[in-house]
């Protein structure tokens, strides 16, 4: 048995010959092409690092936008927390929603650049395990210094984030071990 695809609507027909008419869109037999077994090939898909080798000014703009979008995520979430403290939960939710949209923008810049993400999940997980370990250590050092200088609020907040980084790293390590070791 062969497979035939309607180039108009994408319908796949299995048989010895293409049908006289597409049952979905009504296109004639001449609009069917035989499909060779090529796996799951897609007509197009997102690719990591398409900006590699582009004009220097464009590259700098992409990097600046990535940094800006990441910064906005943090700012908007902080603003959401403040709005909640002042009793404006709807404002807080708007900030959170917009922060997520800014995070999506940042992720697209990251994909274009291909500098902080690669086209391999195992490698991405390992990079994050390593990065979260470093972030945990850096925050622990900062928290310790803040405590030494009697900046209790700074110590408490940064120390809690240090523990969050350890939790993140453990989660990534668990996924790495489950899927790739």
From Swiss-Prot:
Protein name: Reverse rubrerythrin-1
Binding partners and assembly: Homodimer.
Positions that bind Fe cation 1: 6, 9, 22, 25
Metal-binding as UniProt keyword: yes
Function comment: Functions as the terminal component of an NADH peroxidase (NADH:H(2)O(2) oxidoreductase) when using NADH:rubredoxin oxidoreductase (NROR) and rubredoxin (Rd) as electron transport intermediaries from NADH to revRbr 1. Plays an important role in the oxidative stress defense system in C.acetobutylicum, an obligate anaerobic bacterium. Also exhibits NADH oxidase (NADH:O(2) oxidoreductase) activity in vitro, which is 100-fold lesser than that of FprA1/2 using the same electron transfer components.
Catalytic activities: H2O2 + NADH + H(+) = NAD(+) + 2 H2O
Cofactor list: Fe(3+)
One GO MF term attached to the UniProt entry: NADH peroxidase activity
Binding residue positions for Fe cation 2: 69, 102, 165
Induction entry: Up-regulated by heat and oxidative stress (exposure to air, O(2) and H(2)O(2)) (at mRNA and protein levels). Various other environmental stress conditions such as an increase of the pH of the growth medium from 4.5 to 6.2, addition of the salt NaCl or of the solvent butanol, and lowering the incubation temperature also result in transiently increased transcript levels. Is also expressed under non-stressful conditions. Repressed by PerR.
All copies of domain Rubredoxin-like, residue ranges: 1-35
Keyword line: Detoxification, Electron transport, Iron, Metal-binding, NAD, Oxidoreductase, Peroxidase, Stress response, Transport
SUPFAM superfamilies (alphabetical): Ferritin-like (SSF47240), Rubredoxin-like (SSF57802)
Binding site for Fe cation 3: 102, 132, 165, 168
This enzyme's EC code(s): 1.11.1.1
Further comment found in the protein's record: This protein has been named 'reverse' rubrerythrin (revRbr) because the order of the two functional domains is reversed compared to 'classical' rubrerythrins: the rubredoxin-like FeS4 domain is located at the N-terminus and the ferritin-like diiron domain at the C-terminus.
Domain Ferritin-like diiron: 52-181
NAD as UniProt keyword: yes
Cofactor-binding details, from the entry: Binds 3 Fe(3+) ions per subunit.
InterPro entries with a match to the protein in the record: Anaerobic_Peroxidase-Rel (IPR052773), Ferritin-like (IPR012347), Ferritin-like_diiron (IPR009040), Ferritin-like_SF (IPR009078), RevRr_diiron-bd_dom (IPR045236), Rr_diiron-bd_dom (IPR003251), Rubredoxin-like_dom (IPR024934), RUBY_RBDX (IPR048574)
GO biological process, alphabetically ordered: cellular response to alkaline pH; cellular response to cold; cellular response to heat; cellular response to hydrogen peroxide; cellular response to oxygen levels; cellular response to salt stress; hydrogen peroxide catabolic process
Top-level taxonomic group: Bacteria
CDD domains from the UniProt entry: rubredoxin_SM, Rubrerythrin_like
Top-level EC class: oxidoreductase
């Amino acid at each position: 048995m062969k497979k035939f695809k309607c180039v108009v609507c994408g319908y796949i027909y299995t048989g010895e010959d293409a049908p006289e008419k597409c049952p979905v869109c009504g296109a004639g037999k001449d609009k069917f092409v035989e499909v060779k077994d090529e796996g799951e090939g897609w007509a197009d898909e997102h690719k990591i690092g398409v900006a590699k080798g582009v004009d220097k000014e464009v590259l700098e703009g992409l990097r600046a936008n990535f940094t800006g979008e990441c910064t906005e995520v943090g700012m908007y979430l902080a603003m959401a927390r403040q709005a909640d403290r002042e009793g404006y939960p709807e404002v807080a939710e708007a900030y959170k929603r917009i922060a997520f949209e800014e995070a999506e923008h940042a992720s697209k810049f990251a994909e274009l650049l291909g500098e902080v993400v690669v086209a391999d999940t195992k490698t991405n997980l390992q990079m994050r395990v390593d990065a979260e370990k470093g972030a945990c250590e850096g925050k622990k050092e900062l928290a310790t210094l803040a405590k030494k200088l009697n900046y209790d609020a700074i110590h408490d907040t940064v120390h809690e984030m240090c523990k969050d980084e350890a939790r993140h790293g453990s989660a990534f390590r668990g996924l790495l071990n489950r899927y790739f070791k």
